[in-house]
Curated annotation (Swiss-Prot):
It catalyses: apo-[ACP] + CoA = holo-[ACP] + adenosine 3',5'-bisphosphate + H(+). InterPro entries: 4-PPantetheinyl_Trfase_dom, 4-PPantetheinyl_Trfase_dom_sf, ACPS, Ppantetheine-prot_Trfase_dom. SUPFAM superfamilies: 4'-phosphopantetheinyl transferase (SSF56214). The keyword Cytoplasm applies. It comes from Natranaerobius thermophilus (strain ATCC BAA-1301 / DSM 18059 / JW/NM-WN-LF). It is found in: Cytoplasm. One of its GO terms (cellular component) is cytoplasm. Transfers the 4'-phosphopantetheine moiety from coenzyme A to a Ser of acyl-carrier-protein. This is Holo-[acyl-carrier-protein] synthase.
Amino acid sequence: MIIGLGVDIIEIARIKKVYNKFPWKFVNKLFSDREQKKLMTLHNPNEYISGRFAAKEAVAKAFGTGIGQVRWKDIEILTADEGYPVVNLHGEALNKAEELGVTKVYLSISHSKTSAVANAILWSD
């Protein structure tokens, strides 16, 4: 059963501007150590950062809270060996998921040259 649905779209140029101005402050605020490790392997990180930003926003919106009641790092987006995004919840996001009975978070991330979009579904068995 679907518990929540969230979607977010972001302009890659907007993320690129902030990242170029405050690279490590921005990255440390948004990403876990494992997410940062993946970021370090990329030649052009703007799509990755934008997609993950949109994904975290989409998951937070699916909870009905948005970012603010959960921290950016409470929502960790990794990549499965098969290439699809995997959501790991921590802290307040995990507490909220347990409170709502969430058993799985489905996530889709896509990019164009100018935008990144993400859609998140909170699922309960």
